[in-house]
UniProtKB/Swiss-Prot annotation:
EC number: 2.3.1.16
Reaction it catalyzes: an acyl-CoA + acetyl-CoA = a 3-oxoacyl-CoA + CoA
Keyword line: Acyltransferase, Cytoplasm, Fatty acid metabolism, Lipid degradation, Lipid metabolism, Transferase
Subunit description: Heterotetramer of two alpha chains (FadB) and two beta chains (FadA).
Family per record: Belongs to the thiolase-like superfamily. Thiolase family.
Source organism of the structure: Shigella boydii serotype 4 (strain Sb227)
Location of the active site: C91, H343, C373
Entries under InterPro entries matching the protein: FadA, Thiolase, Thiolase-like, Thiolase-like_sf_Thiolase, Thiolase_acyl_enz_int_AS, Thiolase_AS, Thiolase_C, Thiolase_CS
Descriptive protein name: 3-ketoacyl-CoA thiolase
Pathway: Lipid metabolism; fatty acid beta-oxidation
Intracellular or extracellular location(s): Cytoplasm
Any GO MF annotation of the entry: acetyl-CoA C-acyltransferase activity
Gene3D superfamilies per record: 3.40.47.10
Encoding gene (name): fadA
UniProt keyword Acyltransferase present: yes
């Protein structure tokens, strides 16, 4: 079976969804920009040699509809002979895109693929056109479709206090801002055209969603956002709304060597699981455990974790049940996470994987794990190994 390697991984800056940098930039353009950039950064691979493009996107309507993967590829002037497919596993869509490409390569049906994902939550809101089947309430609590309430449920079940959530959210912003200031994101962010507050076209090379002024004291003043009477989850401890895309060049190890391209990491194992929709945010725990089992590893073998921060109330129970509470500052989301950077749904899986690869290199660790919860009760995880 072929070894699957990541040759390159990049992302756009994360733009604020409400009147932000990409308010006049379409999702297809964000995607095409990264496709072009990956090919330009790796000229040894001819675009015509790509076997497929797998692109995650959740709200597949309006500008994100009608197979955005293909539309973006055409905009990027990828040869018409290269196919493209849009993947939807809600929050895990672009990580699923990676898994789909990896399996094609493992079986020998592909040698080189572009994978990634996008979500423009300013142009196509998360709730746009959502119409749950009324019969679902016979089998699943109606609140299971309300992500904030599932986070409230997890917080109550696991004893996660408001103070713990506020502290974690402040940490996310502080670490993301420190990473920005130190240049830690420089290797992954591709400058992307957008508009500043005055409408002037400019190149953005930083995440505009981060709030460096965030403090625990300020967060403590916010009202609960989803359960106004008994709740502890606020807008400040939830993932920000942002627009962005991320992309990776995935190849068989043999093809990368043929072309003289240096792999950055191998895909060591992959896992996806289901869980109770009412605690959808718990999905990373069984997904991570399954991925570790497939890799023949334990959590202690992992040098760095990237865990998507849907909510502080959601990620903290996952950290606790993976036995990592004492290692948060050494291993988990060292450059902040979605609370600070936002969670553009179809983008985030590739985004956290991209950040993870850079952290693995910077920390000089052998293994890294990226994992996410998924709306309606799923979890997805990938173990990477440095080459």
């Amino acid at each position: 079976m072929e070894q699957v390697v990541i040759v390159d991984a990049i992302r756009t800056p994360m733009g604020r969804s409400k009147g932000g940098a990409f308010r006049n930039v379409r999702a297809e353009d964000l995607s095409a920009h990264l496709m072009r950039s990956l090919l330009a950064r790796n000229p040894a691979l001819e675009a015509a040699a790509l076997d497929d493009i797998y692109w995650g996107c959740v709200q597949q309507t309006l500008e994100q509809g009608f197979n955005i993967a293909r539309n973006a590829a055409l905009l990027a002037e990828v040869p018409h002979s290269v196919p493209a497919v849009t993947v939807n596993r809600l929050c895990g869509s672009s990580m699923q895109a990676l898994h789909d490409a990896a399996r094609m390569i493992m079986t020998g049906d592909a040698q080189a693929c572009l994978v990634g994902g996008v979500e423009h939550m300013g142009h196509v809101p998360m709730s746009h056109g959502v119409d749950f089947h009324p019969g679902l309430s016979r089998n699943v609590a109606k609140a299971a479709g309300m992500m904030g309430l599932t986070a409230e449920m997890l917080a109550r079940m696991h004893g996660i206090s408001r103070e713990m959530q506020d502290a974690f959210a402040a940490r996310s912003h502080a670490r993301a801002w420190a990473a920005t200031q130190s240049g830690a994101f420089k290797n992954e962010i591709i400058p992307t055209g957008g508009h500043d507050a005055d409408g002037v076209l400019k190149q953005f090379n930083y995440d505009e969603v981060i709030r460096p002024e965030t403090t625990v004291e300020a967060l403590a003043t916010l009202r609960p956002a989803f359960d106004p009477v008994n709740g502890t989850v606020t807008a400040g401890t939830s993932s920000a709304l942002s627009d962005g895309a991320a992309a990776m060049l995935v190849m068989s190890e043999s093809r990368a060597h043929e072309l003289g391209l240096k792999p950055r990491a191998r895909v060591r194992s992959m896992a996806v699981v289901g869980c109770n929709p009412s605690i959808m945010g718990y999905g990373p725990v069984p997904a991570s455990k399954l991925a570790l089992k497939k890799a023949g590893l334990s959590a202690s073998d992992i040098g760095v974790f990237e865990m998507n921060e849907a909510f502080a109330a959601q990620i903290l129970p996952c950290i606790k049940d993976l036995g990592l509470m004492e290692q948060i500052d050494e291993k988990i989301n060292l450059n902040g996470g979605a609370i600070a950077l936002g969670h553009p749904l179809g983008c985030s899986g590739a985004r956290i994987s991209t950040t993870l690869l850079n952290l693995m290199e910077r920390k000089d660790v052998q293994f890294g794990l990226a994992t996410m919860c998924i709306g309606l009760g799923q979890g997805i995880a990938t173990v990477f190994e440095r080459v």
